[in-house]
């Protein structure tokens, strides 16, 4: 920005305007910004004049998918939303992710999928392998060292440390639209380029965000949807390996998810939600993937039936 524009920028800022490059986001300060640390951090990240140079690799994506398809896991023989058998329900969700990965690869994204399988039965594991064979990228299946939801969470987070790439941590009951992976990569790279800082993307708005924990947000316009700033997410999210490594203290206790006596220590509130004190969080409106577990876990404005029927 030349000297004339700098002077004009200072004058216009008093009236609530900011001069920015056309392709950049322009966030305006809100009243009582000091009373909302999350919004204040978001505004300052986009308003910062001097950007910190970061050399992290954001051109490569690793996807970690946790699977566990067996009779022991299922409480019922069928899913209440789709009405199909649990194994069919989960395998179709896995297929939706594979379709989305292939769509991203068609758009020149460099991706590897690692499946962390927690004792799926032999028939289901064979079906998972068959699905993976249609992938247009590298993939592998890793048998988790210990059984249990918390152990697989801990293991796939630990896997990401020191890898220097984007990471998407996902589980087998998320239904993805074909554009999901490609759009999350594009949005992450675009924001990272503008603010020179890492972020976290939750693929859908948190199920509690309009009830128990409603709060104001910035809304950013993307190419195909809007993106809302968030301070809550599940353990399914998109970020960078350096975030996992730098803030490992917020990941270690995920091993207690599902633990009868210590499960509270592994909750999102006690673990990865603390990341939002340090990095920006976003979720797409409408969602690019949904937790297809129950009616209560669905985000608004998302027709999951159409996505389900198209697979």
For the regions a language model picked out, list residue spans one by one:
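Membrane-proximal basic amphipathic "stem/tether" segments
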Residues: 1-46
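C-terminal catalytic/acceptor-binding lobe
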Residues: 37, 239-311
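Short amphipathic alpha-helices and their capping/turn segments at secondary-structure boundaries
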Residues: 37-62
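Active-site-proximal specificity loops/subdomain of glycosyltransferases
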Residues: 77-78, 116-164
């Amino acid at each position: 920005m030349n000297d004339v524009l700098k002077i004009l920028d200072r004058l216009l800022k008093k009236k609530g305007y900011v001069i920015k490059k056309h392709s950049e986001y322009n966030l305006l300060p809100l009243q009582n910004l000091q009373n909302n640390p999350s919004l204040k951090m978001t505004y300052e990240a986009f308003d910062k004049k001097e950007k910190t140079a970061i050399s992290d690799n954001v051109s490569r994506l690793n996807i970690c998918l946790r699977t566990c398809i067996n009779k022991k896991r299922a409480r019922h023989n069928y899913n209440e939303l789709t009405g199909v058998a649990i194994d069919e329900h989960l395998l179709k969700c896995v297929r939706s992710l594979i379709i989305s990965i292939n769509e991203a690869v068609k758009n020149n994204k460099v991706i590897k999928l690692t499946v962390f399988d927690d004792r799926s039965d032999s028939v289901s594991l064979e079906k998972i392998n068959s699905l993976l064979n249609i992938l247009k990228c590298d993939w592998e299946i890793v048998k988790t060292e210990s059984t249990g939801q918390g152990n697989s969470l801990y293991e796939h987070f630990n896997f990401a440390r020191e890898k220097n790439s984007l990471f998407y941590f996902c589980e087998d009951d998320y239904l993805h639209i074909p554009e999901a992976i490609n759009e999350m990569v594009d949005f992450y790279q675009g924001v990272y380029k503008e603010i020179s800082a890492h972020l976290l993307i939750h693929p859908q708005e948190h199920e509690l965000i309009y009830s128990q924990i409603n709060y104001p947000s910035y809304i950013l316009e993307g190419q195909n949807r809007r993106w809302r700033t968030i301070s809550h997410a599940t353990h399914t999210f998109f970020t960078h390996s350096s975030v996992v490594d730098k803030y490992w203290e917020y990941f270690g206790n995920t091993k207690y998810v599902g633990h009868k006596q210590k499960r509270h220590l592994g909750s999102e509130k006690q673990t990865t939600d603390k990341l939002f004190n340090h990095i920006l969080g976003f979720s797409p409106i409408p969602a690019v993937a949904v937790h297809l577990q129950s009616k209560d876990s669905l985000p608004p404005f998302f027709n999951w039936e159409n996505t389900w029927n198209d697979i």
